[in-house]
UniProtKB/Swiss-Prot annotation:
The keyword Cell division does not apply. This is Chromosomal replication initiator protein DnaA. Keywords: ATP-binding, Cytoplasm, DNA replication, DNA-binding, Lipid-binding, Nucleotide-binding. Residues 368-487 are annotated as: Domain IV, binds dsDNA. GO terms for biological process: DNA replication initiation; regulation of DNA replication.
């Protein structure tokens, strides 16, 4: 059985599993077939063990169907295939093609506006030439090695990152990239709502790469910085220096890639930079507030390349993680915070880590200025404006409308006595979201759903928790709702 059979197997599996599952666990596998045995190579033991447990049986079934009823013996090990193989399904993604890097596209007004508003901190390779040279429009000459500024925040490390179920996969993938930059997970695409820790993980990767190799050239920047540097380089007739700078790094970390939307020339330059880095075995890491395919006004060829490596969602933190974050931040601030107080804040602030930390800072400041002890009543008074705003933003009505629209049913169906599966499951999802995202009690939630008993709400919440463990479709739906309602 040639290795192309493995690619056919991947085509089948891709249609069966959600995109994130497929890209995370199956796509990185490499294959080698010899004498009736298919050896699958995983990038690390974590992936190998997970595939063995969750996917191996289905892989064997698909291979058997594709091979005329005779399944090869499938083995797994950590490492790389002994000869070049292509573990990536390319049927929908064109292979990298060397394109002329010069384009007829011009800089848009929006890109010029960005360049005018972003503070001037361009790399030395693109520094403005002397007035005389600028008047003659001569290309800027760069002598010797390029000096890189990482702009990494040294306080954002893996040690200071609080891990929980919501970010466990993202942290594991980030750590793997830091240990093996330019490896299987290239590019690494981290996406999720605001304030969930994507930027922290990105800095942690960069800091860990530098810790392991102090000579590594790591560049972190927000996407508007890339746009501003490109516009300045064009204005100074220094586009070659711009390209040389960004393509000479060992790891390029771009934050908030969605900012490239509607900026055609920036997308063009990043497309070629992206290709050059991947072809050179250099690591690319990007963050975004949404899944790659959901980014509007961005070229399809660029969005497709984001999916070549590993795409991981960073989810809103669950209660236990929120409590752990608060306790860790309080410890760093040398503030005594009881577990009762931490739980109170964590139960009230559910949306993201940034808002959670902001709430804690406000409570600590009020306690410092008033000399008060941090207790639940004191916290409630300190955060009354924030809690009122939070409750207003995420209401049961909003949840019901969002869920009904998503499942293409009516809000009245959610409130009715109907018990068909097409209504019952969305109703349970909406109840669970109401419990997690609002401060309403179970009886209040029950009243909002047609006068149901609080035990019905509790059963619905438990059911959705169970289904998220066993049903990929429900898990993906729930994650989508959390993003829609909290960002």
């Amino acid at each position: 059985m040639p290795n192309s059979m493995w690619h056919q197997c991947l085509e089948v599996l891709r249609d069966e599993f959600p995109a994130q599952q497929f890209n995370t666990w199956l796509r990185p596998l490499q294959s080698d077939h010899r004498e009736g045995q298919l050896m699958l190579f995983a990038p690390n033991r974590f992936v190998m063990d997970w595939v063995n447990e969750k996917y191996l049986r289905r892989i064997e079934e698909v291979l058997k169907d594709l091979n005329g009823g005779q399944a090869p013996r499938v083995m797994m090990k950590v490492g790389s295939a002994p000869k070049p193989t292509d573990p990536v399904v390319r049927s929908e993604v064109a292979p990298p093609v060397r394109v002329s890097e010069e384009t007829e596209q011009t800089v848009t007004e929006e890109e010029r506006s960005v360049a005018a508003t972003v503070a001037d901190s361009a790399p030395r390779a693109m520094s403005a030439p002397a007035p005389k040279a600028q008047a003659e429009r001569r290309p800027v000459q760069v002598e010797g090695d390029i000096k890189h500024q990482s702009f990494l925040n040294e306080t954002f490390t893996f040690d200071t990152f609080v891990e929980g179920k919501s970010n466990q996969l993202a942290r594991a993938a980030s750590m793997q990239v830091a240990e093996n930059p330019g490896g299987a997970y290239n590019p690494l695409f981290l996406y999720g709502g605001v304030g969930l820790g994507k930027t922290h993980l990105m800095h942690a990767i960069g800091n860990e790469i530098v810790r392991r190799n102090p000579r590594a050239k790591v560049a972190y920047l927000r996407s508007e910085r890339f746009v501003a540097d490109m516009v300045k380089a064009l204005q100074l007739n220094a586009i070659n220096e711009f390209k040389r700078y960004y393509r000479s790094v060992d790891a390029l970390l771009i934050d908030d890639i969605q900012f490239f939307a509607r900026k055609e020339r920036s997308q063009e330059e990043f497309f070629h930079t992206f290709n050059a880095l991947l072809e050179g075995g250099q690591q690319v890491i990007v963050t975004c507030d949404r899944f790659p395919k959901e980014i509007s006004d961005m070229e399809e060829r660029l969005k497709s390349r984001f999916g070549w490596g590993l795409t991981v969602m960073v989810e809103p933190p669950e209660l236990e993680t929120r409590v752990a974050i608060l306790m860790k931040k309080a410890e760093q601030a040398n503030v005594k915070l009881s577990s009762e107080a931490a739980f109170f804040i964590a139960q009230k602030i559910r949306s993201n880590v940034r808002e959670l930390e902001g709430a804690l800072r406000l409570v600590i400041a009020n306690a410092h200025f008033t000399g008060s002890e941090i207790t639940p009543p004191f916290i409630r008074e300190s955060l009354k404006d924030l809690l009122a705003l939070h409750e207003k933003q995420v209401s049961i009505d909003n949840i019901q409308r969002t869920v009904a629209e998503y499942y293409k049913i009516k809000v009245a169906d959610l409130l009715s006595k109907r018990r068909t599966r097409t209504v019952t499951r969305p109703r349970q999802v909406a109840m669970s979201l109401a419990k997690e995202l609002t401060n309403h009690s179970l009886p209040e939630i029950g009243d909002a759903f047609g006068g149901r008993d609080h035990t019905t709400v509790l059963h619905a919440c438990k059911k959705i928790v169970e289904l998220q463990e066993t049903d990929p479709g429900i898990r993906e739906d729930y994650q989508n709702f959390m993003r829609l309602l909290t960002t």
